[in-house]
Amino acid sequence: MPYAILVVSALLYGLALNLPVGTMPLALLADGTAAPAVAIAMGSGMFAALFVSLPIGALTDRIGRLPMLRASAGLGILSLLGLGFAHGPVLGGILLGIRSIALVGYMTAEFAYAGEIASKERAVSGVATLGMIGNLTFAIAPAVSVFLWQHGIGREQYAWACGLAICGFALLFALPGKFDERRGRGTRAPILMHPRWYPAVGFALACTLQGGVNGSLAILTFHQRGIVNGAAIFTASAFTSFALRYPAGRLVDRFGPRAVAVPTALLSALGCVFAASAHSLLAVVFAGLLLGTSWAAVVPVALGLLFEHSSSRTRGAAMGAYTLAFSAGAATGATVATLATLAGGGYTIAMTLCAVGPLAVLPYVLRSRRSARVLRGLREVATPS
């Protein structure tokens, strides 16, 4: 029951908070904001997430999952309400940054709490499947927001959506405290980043590079190549990832993250290569299918590596490292896209570089060792009572 409550809360909250992704650029342009200023305002959320991921993870361990969940949900509602009335790139950028901080806090505490609900044998698939809700709301909400905008419903849609977010917020108070964990005062200093989390962070970052490049250049590049609907790469990837996330999580539960990391890295590299050379809609869709299959496993692989070296008392910090990895990967990918374009290689060179990333990090992941604590835990699970 707590897991179902968390899923419904995440669905309602995510649908509301992701509406501005689709129409805030249109709203800012309607205010007369120049295109570069719009890009900076929209990018403020990305950089806010980079700066706060680790501190929020440590704070989650300090105060507990439920307080962080509720505080983040409340902050997100306030930011959404503000976006319904704010005008101009400065105030809009600030509120988008606050929105991003709220989402990072919500997701960090949500995943840490869910990790305690699921059994040890299904911890990875349980948390990874919950992450599908975020992917689903990100796929649906911006498109719905644009549809509403096209039918004359502007910024007021954000204020109306606060109703959904408030419903999600209210559900959080139905979650039992027995799955919460906090360090409290008088304990050791909070952990921001443990060295044994580096393989998980590196792998997630390397596999997320392509997302930053595709978000920056894919549609424009495919349009220049004569492909009518280049956005098909995102559609194919999103639906494939959604369909395969739970099976991928169960594979990690069963065989461990390192065994699944090998085909994941290979599929990511192949997807990048096919996307770089795609000159037809069929090739674009095929590249999206490969990238979506890989992406379905990236999340559970990263979670599995993090769970190996984190306990209940450090799970918040581990999830902070998780959110940092994906935020940094997208930001780095966007930077790679910009540099490749300036160098004249554009999308082809950028995606080729992205293909190298997961393969380069893979040996580091395979060499990483489990902690003695986890090995003992696995032996206990394998020993019949």
What are these regions (language model features)?
Residues 67-81, 259-273:
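Structural signature of the two symmetry-related core transmembrane helices
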Residues 105-118, 297-310:
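Intracellular juxtamembrane helix-capping segments at the cytosolic ends
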